[in-house]
Regions:
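C-terminal alpha-helical interaction appendages
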Residues: 1-71
Length: 71
């Protein structure tokens, strides 16, 4: 993971935490345990970082929902 994708992941953790009224550490655990960080956010950074924050937050929520994780 390079600096840019790392910063993006941190930003998205905080954006999701704000949107879902959760603390960032809980969101990190959800994303890490579901594989969202390593299998979605980092590999698709080039596309995702060009999208709006709300769009990516919704996309992450959908990713988690498909895997049976409720936020």
């Amino acid at each position: 993971m390079n600096k840019e994708s790392f910063a993006f992941v941190i930003y998205m953790i905080h954006a999701c935490a704000n949107s879902w009224s959760k603390v960032p550490s809980d969101v990190y655990k959800l994303l890490q345990n579901s594989g969202c960080i390593d299998n979605y956010l980092v590999p698709h950074y080039d596309i995702l970082h060009t999208q709006g924050t709300e769009y990516v937050v919704d996309d992450i929520k959908e990713y988690l929902g498909i895997r049976g994780v409720n936020v």
